[in-house]
Design a protein with these regions (language model features):
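Non-catalytic accessory segments of hydrolases
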Residues: 15-203, 224, 330, 489-510, ...
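Substrate-gating cap/lid region and adjacent catalytic-acid/histidine neighborhood
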Residues: 299, 303-500, 518
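Short Gly/aromatic-enriched secondary-structure transition segments
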Residues: 56-62, 66-79, 368-386, 390-394, ...
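Serine-hydrolase-like catalytic core of hydrolytic proteins
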Residues: 3-7, 105-294, 344-367
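Mobile gating loops/cap/lid regions near enzyme active sites that modulate substrate access
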Residues: 49, 422, 430-593
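Non-transmembrane alpha-helical segments in soluble domains
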Residues: 147, 207-210, 214, 275-279, ...
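Cleavable N-terminal signal peptides of Sec/SRP-targeted secreted and luminal proteins
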Residues: 2-19
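A structural signal for well-ordered alpha-helical segments within the folded catalytic domains
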Residues: 55, 113-116, 168, 204-211, ...
């Protein structure tokens, strides 16, 4: 039974903490040591780009591994260990089929369901002396700000590994960086609408990690009251959902959403569709009672589940199982009890400062995948595919109207991949960012940027073998985290580089760290004037990050037709708005300068 906020689980955690006070092992051969609530860990000392050192603790379990009967269950507390645990090598990634990252994601630790681990990176001077008990006095030792980062990957692939999420740019600026793995695809987002599998296991894993951070932050020199939750792509969508969730309240203070998207539908109708396609691939009758399906899934070998999951990914393109709105289940506190937009409109999450980022050419990064699945050919057969999955509840006579609006704006009577990529960028990334900023601004600071710096030597483009103008999906992330799989070992001269790429990495990491510390990406009189927060009930402004010398260029999304078109396309929450939309023509939008 899922009870992540229940008194029973909290009591169990308290018992574990009291019952196991880690005995101090021999730490003489350990470069960097830290205690946790379940035992001591031995990490490694590494060098950041500034030349400073940090302690890196890899593959630290934040819960018991979900094996066997625990495959789809709420995570249980991690089991304690007596000797010191080596934490110098990354653990396995969660089971997945990667159709996007290519050689950028190395999975150096293999792949396994025993993947529930966190990676903790701490400036060496902040790490508590292992010879002394950690200070629990916040006034005497306030602790460093903590960035908890949720990796992206369409809810289906990816990891918190340092191949893409190297902390070298951030830890040198006085913050702690924590990345982690969570269950993916069917293991993380299957819903049987039952007490055994209510859905959103990957989100529950994230809440479990956040609770672990609250209990263990002091052991690593961090402040449990200064946690910023960040994510990229699917990870940003998860972070945004958790800003709305009562189950995650008080576990973090700020949120950073990079390439946030609402490209998935959290509806029960979508759940039924995905399940009806998936279960037959495993020889399971989709009409069986939920408890019987659950048992069959537990008994099914992992390789068979992954084979079926790959077939489903090939059918859908990238994303399959996703976060869903949970129905009421006795004894279970839902992560997501209603559509995120409904919760936003009710005022939920407006007390959390937000930094929202997107790139100017998001979907160029997906060009190889869209070519592989022949997305243009699929649209020719099914024109309604140009419409966002969030609008799939439209009736048959409304879908063609929305599709016509999209065709008029993006294709000019010629359906091609270039037009689709522009549509994809606007529909799944740019407009959701505008919409979210508009809905959440006013009561708390909300800032937004568009990253359009293409780079001199882009690690992202090199890693995927891509060439295009501007910045694609994930590309801004590579100026915040170091792409170690492409860049290789940190060079001795890297900290002294002064080219535009190095300056941009410094600028972007400054933005993240400033927001973590001050709830403003550019604090001080200069920044307040050049990067104002988004005003309530007004079209959101964003800053154009297109180079280290031109990062302060303000933009307004209403300066082109894009915002007008999508405001009309998405104005479908009420019947009246649908009727208004059906009479809309892009010709009537007025440009503002």
């Amino acid at each position: 039974m899922t009870v992540f906020t229940s008194a029973a689980l909290l009591a169990a955690l308290a018992i574990v903490a009291r019952a196991h006070t880690p005995s101090k092992p021999d730490l003489s051969r350990c470069e960097a040591a830290a205690r946790t609530e379940t035992g001591w860990v031995c990490g490694a000392r590494r060098r950041a780009v500034s030349g400073s050192e940090y302690a890196s603790f890899l593959a630290v379990p934040y819960a018991k591994q979900p094996l066997g009967e625990l495959r789809f269950q709420e995570l249980l507390p991690a089991e304690p260990w007596d000797n010191i645990r080596e934490a110098k090598v990354e653990g396995p990634v969660c089971p997945q089929t990667d159709v996007f990252y290519g050689r950028i994601k190395t999975a150096s630790g293999g792949m396994s369901e025993a993947c529930i681990h966190a990676n903790i990176h701490v400036p060496i001077e902040a790490l508590p002396d292992p010879k002394k008990p950690p200070s629990l006095d916040a006034k005497a030792a306030p602790g460093l700000p903590i960035l908890v980062f949720i990796h992206g990957g369409g809810f289906a692939f990816g990891s918190g590994d340092t191949d893409l999420h190297g902390p070298e740019y951030l830890v040198s600026k006085g913050v702690i960086v924590i990345t982690f793995n969570y269950r993916l695809n069917v293991f993380g987002f299957l819903s049987l609408n039952s007490t055994q599998v209510p859905g959103n296991a990957g989100l529950r894993d994230t809440v479990t990690l956040l609770r672990w951070v609250q209990r263990n932050a002091r052991f690593f020199g961090g402040s449990p009251g200064a946690v910023t939750l960040a994510g990229q792509s699917a990870g940003a969508s998860m972070a945004q959902i958790l800003t709305l969730s009562t189950g995650a309240r008080s576990l973090f203070r700020r949120a950073i959403l990079l390439s946030f998207s609402d490209y998935f539908s959290p509806s029960a109708q979508f759940v039924k569709t995905i399940n009806s396609l998936f279960f037959p691939l495993l020889g399971i009758n989709a009409t069986l009672p939920a408890d019987e399906i659950h048992q069959k899934l537990i008994e099914t070998p992992i390789n068979e589940i992954m084979d079926a999951n790959k077939k489903l990914i090939d059918l859908f393109g990238v994303t399959t199982f996703t976060p869903i709105v949970e129905s009421y289940q006795p004894g279970i506190t839902p992560i997501l009890e209603d559509d995120p937009e409904v919760l936003l409109d009710s005022g939920r999450g407006r007390d959390i400062p937000l930094l929202i980022g997107f790139t100017d050419a998001e979907c160029e990064s997906f060009r190889p995948r869209f070519e592989q699945i022949d997305i243009v050919g699929q649209i020719e057969k099914t024109p309604a595919l140009v419409v966002s999955p969030r609008l799939t509840f439209l009736s048959g006579d409304q879908l063609p109207v929305v599709a016509e609006l999209i065709y008029n704006k993006y294709f000019n009577d010629t359906l091609d991949l270039d037009g689709f990529l522009r549509l994809c960028t606007d529909q799944f990334y740019k407009y959701p960012a505008f919409k979210l900023a508009s809905k959440t601004s006013g009561e708390t600071p909300v800032f937004m940027y568009r990253f359009s710096y293409g780079g001199v030597d882009s690690a992202w483009k090199e890693g995927l073998g891509l060439k295009f103008e501007g910045a694609g999906h994930v590309e801004d992330l590579t100026y915040i985290f170091r792409t170690n799989s492409v860049l290789g070992p940190l060079g001795v001269n890297e900290s002294t580089r002064r080219d535009d790429d190095a300056k941009m990495k410094n600028k972007m990491s400054d933005i993240i760290v400033n927001f973590m510390k001050y709830s403003h990406p550019m604090p001080g009189p200069l920044g307040a004037g050049q990067w104002p927060k988004t005003a309530a009930r007004r079209p959101p402004q964003y800053l154009e990050a297109n180079g280290p010398k031109r990062i302060f260029k303000k933009k307004n999304p209403t300066s082109n037709l894009q915002h007008c078109v999508y405001k009309s396309i998405y104005a479908i929450q009420m019947k009246m708005e649908i009727q208004q939309m059906m009479h809309f023509r892009p010709l009537y939008c007025v440009r503002t300068h």
